[in-house]
Each structure stands twice: as structure tokens, then as C-alpha cells.
Amino acid sequence: MNIWAPAPEPPTKLGRHRQLAPGCGLHVSPIQLGAMSIGDKWHPYGMGTMDKEASFKLLDAFYNAGGNFIDTANVYQDETSEEFIGEWMEARGNRDQMVVATKYSLVYKRGASFEEIPQKTQYVGNSLKSMHISVHDSLRKLRTSYIDIFYVHFWDYTCTIEEVMNGLHNLVAQGKVLYLGVSDTPAWVVSKANNYARMAGKTPFVIYEGEWNITMRDMERDIIPMCIHEGMAIAPWNVLCAGKIRTDAEEERRLKSGEGGRTLLQFDGWLRNETERKVSKALEKVAEEIGAKSITSVAIAYLMQKFPYVFPIVGGRKVEHLYANLEALDISLSPEQMQFLNDTVPFNKGFPYLLFGDGSDYNIVHKAAGHYDKWPAQQAIRPQK
């Protein structure tokens, strides 16, 4: 027998792991399992929930398909998301095989009454105390001695960059956290934080998580260029527009059955607006051209093929939806199809990009002076045949 015989083929392409970022050697599945639905506390607020049995079933399906990358937060489902994931890893004995990302900064004790916890101001924000309490609670709930990726959930504008980055670095030095991430934060803050970390010998951020989908492309203005420059991975959330990427037939079925859809943070309800219907039609057209079974898988592939080091966070409660979304790993979109989807909802980068470009080509000033051949940008990984 060959001691270095190749590993067996993974059950699905989810098991073809890839390097997280240029600045991070961690290898993860190309799609993350979003765990905001895992847990049983948020149903009253318009969010789907899952009891422990259903949560374990979904986690098993993800793991058995080759997935190892889970995204959660201290606040999800009033802390039961972390608890269920921790119990599942302990029961399956697979903690070291998994890459678990969690977060701090949102008020994660909001599920407790003010009779139980009269003062909650220490359980929210970016402060060192909030960080300290949260990471210790997350370690306990996840039943682990370390967190793979620890995120600042949002920037609260009350702490200095030095306080946050020094505190995060200390967690890395103590072995409680391996890598650092940042979410829902302006590009200038992240750039300044990483510059401070490098200059001061601290640990920089290696991944950015933010809202990005075919209808919401604001991250393409400053955040994604910043990630490319900083050597950071990109973790888009809400990639399926809160479940509003659906066909007319699917929406009609939900209306008739009374199933409805997610309403948490959806201030205009669960039904699609005009833009979402237009986008769904465009995705349906592309799906028909390439023979894809699901328009959601086309929406995921669209993001993954725009830039390198993109790891979409895909949630949900049903195993069949998880498997349907894995079709994204088999889809290869042509430049014409990518442009067609780009044009469905025009995106204006604004000043100064409209004046002098975004660096993807030489601008009008250069072109007035001469002719150039530009080196191509690094491309995303395309599906393996």
C-alpha cells in the first residue's frame, strides 16, 4: 500500500475544501452553513426555528456532504444556536474537524428578562469587557476550548481600534481564538485596524462578513476592494435575499398553503417586491440556459464567481434545500451571463469611481496618454469537472 495514497473522493463538491484567504492557511468548505435558524427561540419574531432533533439532522447532512464551515453568533436564537452546535459536535466527536465562526457585540442576553438580568449594558458593544464575557460564554456553549474564527459583529463607534485589536490579539495569544473576522463594519475602520495590527505586532482580520447579494451590491463599492487589498476572505450573508429569491410558482404555492416566509427584519413583509421579482426572473432565465434545477443555486454561483475567496453563508432549515443549494458548486456562468445578471439591478459606484474608474481598467486620463496591456486580476475558482 502507498502511505501517501490519495484521499477518497468526497461525497459532494462541498468536500473539496479551499484556502480561506491569502493571509490565512485554514482550509474550509466552499459554502458555509449559516446557523441563525439553528435553535428554538426566535419563532415569535418571524424567524424560522429548529428544535434540537431537526438541528442535528441539518448539521449531520452538512457534515456528511463534506461541509466543515459553520457560521453562528452569540446572539442567534437567544444563544441556543451555539448550544445546539456545541452539543452536536460533542455527540459526534468531530470538533477538530469543524471550523466554527462565532461573533460578539450584539446584546446576546436580550432573551433574558430584566428580572433575570436587571443590567445588560455589559453584554453589548465592542468593549473589552463585552468581548471577555462573550468569548467565555461562547466557549462554554460550544463545548470547546477554542473558537476557529471570532468576529466583531458590528462596529459600535465607542471603542478605539487599539482597545478592540489588543483585546482580540490577547485571545489569540491565549489560544482561545485562532483567527479574527469582522462583520458589518466600514472599510476604512477595517483597513485602519489591520494596519494598526501589523504595525503593532498584533493579529489582523482575515475575513469580512457582510450583506451582499444580486440585489444589494454595496459591498462592491469599497469593502470588497478592501478585502482584496488586505488579503481577506469574503463571507456574504443574506445571499438569497431573506428567501425572496423564488419563482412565481413557489410564491403562489406559499400563498395557497399559508406557509409564508421569513419576516424577521423584513419590514415590507415576506412577499417579493418588484426588484426581487425581476431578479428572480433573470435567475430563472439563466437557470434554463444552463440546465440548473434551482434559481437559488444560480444566485449563489453568481457571487462565488465574481471574486476569489468568497464563501457564501447559506442557512435554512430543510435538508432538501441544503442539497439543492449545493448545485451552485456545479454551475459555471459565462461572462455574458454574469453581465446579464449584473445589469438586472444596475449598480452605481458613485464618486470618485465614476470619474476616474475603479482600477479594473486604465482610466480616461491614462488612455489619453497612450495604450496599455493590463495584467488580469485573480479569478475565482471554477467548478471541477
UniProtKB/Swiss-Prot annotation:
Record keywords, A-Z: Aromatic hydrocarbons catabolism, NADP, Oxidoreductase
The keyword Nucleotide-binding appears for this protein: no
Entries under SUPFAM superfamilies matching the protein: NAD(P)-linked oxidoreductase (SSF51430)
Residues involved in NADP(+) binding: N238, V239, L240, C241, A242, G243, K244, I245, R246, T247, D248
Active site annotation, chain numbering: Y76
Similarity comment: Belongs to the aldo/keto reductase family. Aldo/keto reductase 2 subfamily.
Name of the protein described by the UniProt record: Aryl-alcohol dehydrogenase [NADP(+)]
Top-level taxonomy: Eukaryota, Fungi, Dikarya, Basidiomycota, Agaricomycotina
